[in-house]
Amino acid sequence: MGDPLLPGSTGLGSGGTAAATGGTGTTGTGLGSGGTSGTERPPSPARLTHTSEKHPKVTLTELNMLRRHRELCDVVLNVGGRKIFAHRVILSACSSYFCAMFTGELEESRQTEVTIRDIDENAMELLIDFCYTAHIIVEESNVQTLLPAACLLQLVEIQDICCEFLKRQLDPTNCLGIRAFADTHSCRELLRIADKFTQHNFQEVMESEEFLLLPVGQLVDIICSDELNVRSEEQVFNAVMSWLKYNVAERRQHLAQVLQHVRLPLLSPKFLVGTVGSDLLVRSDEACRDLVDEAKNYLLLPQERPLMQGPRTRPRKPTRRGEVLFAVGGWCSGDAIASVERFDPQTNDWKMVAPMSKRRCGVGVAVLNDLLYAVGGHDGQSYLNSIERYDPQTNQWSCDVAPTTSCRTSVGVAVLDGFLYAVGGQDGVQCLNHVERYDPKENKWSKVAPMTTRRLGVAVAVLSGHLYAIGGSDGQCPLNTVERYDPRQNKWVAVNPMSTRRKHLGCAVFNNYIYAVGGRDDCMELSSAERYNPLTNTWSPIVAMTSRRSGVGLAVVNGQLYAVGGFDGSAYLKTIEVYDPETNQWRLCGCMNYRRLGGGVGVMRAPQTENYMWCAK
């Protein structure tokens, strides 16, 4: 059998299709003579139903032109000294606020110039533009004025878009400010998401300036949550004391109110006595001393603990975000595929997500800046240099990434120092040693030093600031050689080879080793596996997988090593197996929805907000 990952040996060919037409006579339309049937039927009335898809857009465009030329305008909005011309009927159709203003008994219903107060004039102009164009750009510079304006005008769609934008901007340095902003404007969903984000990232949030500026009520709301994500209750106490000491004069009166929400009974005895009990501010407050005594009793009298249960003795149970694995493209049932699915180890469940715009086998996949990149591949007919990028927050692929300088399939892709590297592969003419890297800030690829050996079906890995190119084929035979790239010197050097020749192998870094599994040698698909120790520059074997797998994906998810799909010599695989380094054993742990040979795999953190769509629309 030929190499199943090389398009020339897949058995692909152009198939013929035939169409036949039958003699059905003449069909009567009411516009001419009918057929020769012996039974005459009265002609049906002529009818053509038409619904124009472009009519709404054209109409809005013309209405906006009338507004721009101040023609047929029947109202002028005076906002912050700026005059905005408009048509009442358009404003009323888009905004409940304007509808009530112009159709009721309010004085404004009879005025040709209406003054709108407490709203930013630039925001108002953007919102009126949206009413006429259905287009708006929300960005960091305008969202804080757009959202209040949209709330006032009751433009719910814009409120939702602003909240969506703010959800995507959440980080530990601004989540408290966004939370307060959401609370002020009654954006309940944004408030809930900001709360969840704050709880999950509390260890970073507590270091921010926003945290130190919190009013006491908001501080209490945060630290009383059962879902606060902390390693120990000591972090909560330290956070509270940092907040207090930021303005001791004004805040010491609130110490007992806040400290009652710190779960002192869950502290270690050493920390409780040595740190909490000895703190001068705590010792000077009677209510705080009582809280410390309560915690001491809980720790010293274990037999009494069943009678002392309460909110302060309840362990926190944070909701932890795990990692998820994506399987992208590949070869299935004789053709390249565009389908993508994700695996959640916590539920042991595979679900389909949005497919790529192109079918891709031999695709290189990597994650950069929380976005999944699919590089090159083969679509069943052509070698590709195009790239797609997946955003898990929106469940959408975008194609605005600059293409690689060469078409590449069976390419190795990895991320090093904020750059995306594309290594080797083939372009339909020859096997490649070219290497290029992508700068996401510039949306540009640039070439770096080529490898010393041409490699298709190469595996790549990043370890200790170096990029490794492992195995593959030079176009004639599989390789066991390995070379390492140093970006500081822009140079490749050879390291010790693997014990087995492997092309289309799987590769991943796990516990500071590089693992190489499966692939194909000169004769057959492989189940064997080995790992590389960079400290000793040596390869050593590990136990073989349960199945032979060429074109296998290998990835580390939540601290476990997974082998995904591949080809066993007779069938495409959808099984996955996981490796346990302590027992040196592989075990099967489920199946994908699709069989995949030569698909890419990537690992991402589950989105920090809950506003994402894993499932394909």
From Swiss-Prot:
Pathway: Protein modification; protein ubiquitination. GO terms for biological process: negative regulation of synaptic assembly at neuromuscular junction; protein ubiquitination. InterPro entries: BACK, BTB-kelch_protein, BTB/POZ_dom, Gal_Oxase/kelch_b-propeller, Kelch-typ_b-propeller, Kelch_1, SKP1/BTB/POZ_sf. Residues 175-277 form the BACK domain. Kelch repeats lie at residues 324-370, 372-418, 419-465, 467-512, 514-559, 560-606. Keywords: Actin-binding, Kelch repeat, Repeat, Ubl conjugation pathway. SUPFAM superfamilies: Galactose oxidase, central domain (SSF50965), Kelch motif (SSF117281), POZ domain (SSF54695). Residues 1-55 are annotated as: Disordered. GO terms for molecular function: actin binding. Residues 10-37 have a biased composition (Gly residues). Signal peptide: none annotated. It holds the Pfam family Kelch_1. Residues 73-140 form the BTB domain. Probable substrate-specific adapter of an E3 ubiquitin-protein ligase complex which mediates the ubiquitination and subsequent proteasomal degradation of target proteins. May have a role in synapse differentiation and growth. This is Kelch-like protein diablo. It comes from Drosophila mojavensis.
